[in-house]
């Protein structure tokens, strides 16, 4: 548990770093990230681009580790993201949203697959609605 918690803390720091490659470094070479049941980002290059989308859209992006649940072989990484949508084409609106990722870990101790989830309707309301 301590090792996995340390990994989760490092993953959180990677999301806060502004460097999407640091996020991808936590995935196996052919690892995948799927957000809200969408098309998976497969491989580190694709994961870099997925992370870059959030980081570019929210230059002040901050992710906070809310908890780590271990139930069976798939740990759940619970997080809260805050940031202001001031990137290209941004609305200037502030977002605060919580969600989680269900991880399948590789034999190397990296993420082989992450299934991420958050309330997309709430996200859309926060990003696009008038204050």
Show which residues each predicted segment covers:
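Short histidine/acidic/glycine/proline-rich micro-motifs that form metal-
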Residues: 37-40
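Short, well-ordered alpha-helical segments enriched in acidic and aromatic residues
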Residues: 17-30, 34
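A short alpha-helix capping/helix-coil boundary motif
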Residues: 1, 15, 29-30, 79
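Solvent-exposed, amphipathic alpha-helical segments
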Residues: 3-17
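Surface-exposed charged/polar residues within alpha-helices that form helix-capping/stabilizing sites
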Residues: 10-13, 25, 53
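A beta-strand edge to alpha-helix "cap/lid" segment located at domain peripheries
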Residues: 3, 34, 48-131
């Amino acid at each position: 548990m301590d090792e996995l918690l340390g990994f989760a803390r490092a993953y959180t720091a990677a999301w806060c770093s502004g460097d999407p490659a640091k996020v991808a470094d936590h995935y196996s070479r052919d690892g995948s990230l799927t957000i809200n049941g969408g098309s998976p980002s497969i491989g580190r290059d694709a994961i870099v681009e997925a992370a870059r989308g959030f980081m570019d859209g929210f230059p002040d992006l901050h992710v906070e580790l809310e908890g780590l649940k271990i139930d069976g072989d798939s740990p759940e990484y619970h997080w809260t993201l805050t940031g202001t949508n001031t990137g290209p084409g941004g609305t200037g609106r502030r977002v605060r949203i919580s969600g989680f990722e269900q991880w399948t870990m590789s034999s190397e101790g990296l993420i082989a697959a992450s299934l991420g989830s958050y309330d997309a309707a709430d996200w859309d309301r926060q990003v696009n609605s008038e204050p």
